[in-house]
Amino acid sequence: MTKIHFRPYNPNQTVLFPQRIDEDIAENDPVRMVDALVEGLNLESFRKLYKECGRSPYHPRMMLKVILYAYMNNIYSCRKIEKLLHRDIHYIWLAGYEKPDFITINRFRNRVKKEINEVFTQTVLLLSSKGFISLNVEYIDGTKIESKANKYTFVWRKTVERNRERLMKKIHVLLGQIDDVIAREKSSENNEEVGFTPAMLAEMAGELRHALEQVSEPSAKEEKTELKKKRKQLKELEEHRDKLQEYDCHPETLQERNSYSKTDKDATFMRMKEDAMRNGQTKPGYNLQIGTENQFITDFALFPNPTDTLTLIPFLQSFSNRYDRMAHTVVADSGYGSEENYRFMSENGMEAYVKYNYFHMEQRPRFKPDPFKAENFYYNEEHDFCICPMGQRMRRIGTRNVKTASGYVNENARYRAVRCEGCPLRCRCFKAKGNRTIELNHRLRQYKRRAKELLCSEKGLKHRGQRCIEPEAVFGQIKNNMNYKRFRHFGKDKVFMDFAFLAIAFNIKKMCAKLTKKGMNWLIRLFYELTTAVFRCWEHINQRNLQKIAA
């Protein structure tokens, strides 16, 4: 029988000259890109977050590397990151054999809630300098992501207003039953129209309690019953006071929203795409808006609006505040097509490849415009009149201003036919009595006409095709590939911080994928060497400045 010779195996063998840990990491491994990129960032703003006295904290650059690399690998739990710092060679190398616990990691994330936004901006500018993006085109889209809060923690504005009115009526009835001069005076001074405040009820309850304490303990049965009744009424008054104070706090939290969650007061109840019961149940969440270019996230923001229409202008302003410039080209779907949005983009010199309602329907081969719809009537701009399908002239009778939820005023011109009685097309035209009246928004029609020209042009067709694989692909990768389907923190500031880490990790991961796909591993090494050299130069200059200050 042939003897089998196995390779020597001794896991407890002592090495005389230990090798460097990064020798077992491939040169084109993404962990090297994370290390190089973070080394090239300016983290001077992180210094103000630490105290000069006490125990020396972990280096923020090391903590940032570890968290970003964990997010790149779909690991968002601080406890799992702590385990990997003891087991995984990539995390051990990034941390330099440091082993912060999960509390320290989570505390660092919460500490850099504002500074991480600046890190994201630096990362995008670095991508722009390397030629991955130009920041001239912004593909915008939104998605609703569920909050960590429970779906049964809702507070509705209408319910609060209705219950507050009922409580006011109960208070008036209760004060009418209390046999006390002070209570009667307060009740007469404050009728149902004026209402009460928690401070008034607290004052009244205190005076009534003081009056009851002055009364000696009665001996008769009827007097005991009456005293017991008054104490019960006092207890009810105090309960109404507490409830009224609770109802008065709700509008401050709601502000312009119609709902919020008790456990996550920044979350708004919305209908999500993931509806397992198919009953349209609302869940607490945020409307996440992102801007992408070449499938890199260039900007992001969180909004309480369930729809996308009111988010476009503040989102474009967010892009301007971040990069001190406006995007030259904006591409978005029909959810953003409104007069206010078109006007803002036109005034800021943007090319708006933004669809409007019924745009896709108009592009169908079998589409035929309905001649009886007001927007399809012939309009004479010179003499300001419309012509109905029967050929009758419709004269201008006035203007109606419509105020939107954002406060913008739409001007709708009103036109009315002279005589619709006996018209053979009346049954198909309208069903109301009298002569037909229509409203037209001429400014919006001009914006739609301009948008249609841009969207149907050769450049517009290219942007329309690109939009389908820009933000939609990013959302698909975030939700399915990176398993980021629900926020893991309470509060808008913490949710924003968590997604900022994810956006940075996503951009680094995308950059590594693009370089590796093109077989440009040598570029990764070059990028590593350049960023490391820049960081060393910046550190040397900063050290010299500190020495001058110390001198």
Residue ranges and their predicted role:
Residues 1-32:
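Hydrophobic alpha-helical membrane-insertion signals
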Residues 26-68, 442:
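Basic, short loop/linker segments at the boundary and entry of helix-turn-helix/winged-helix-like folds
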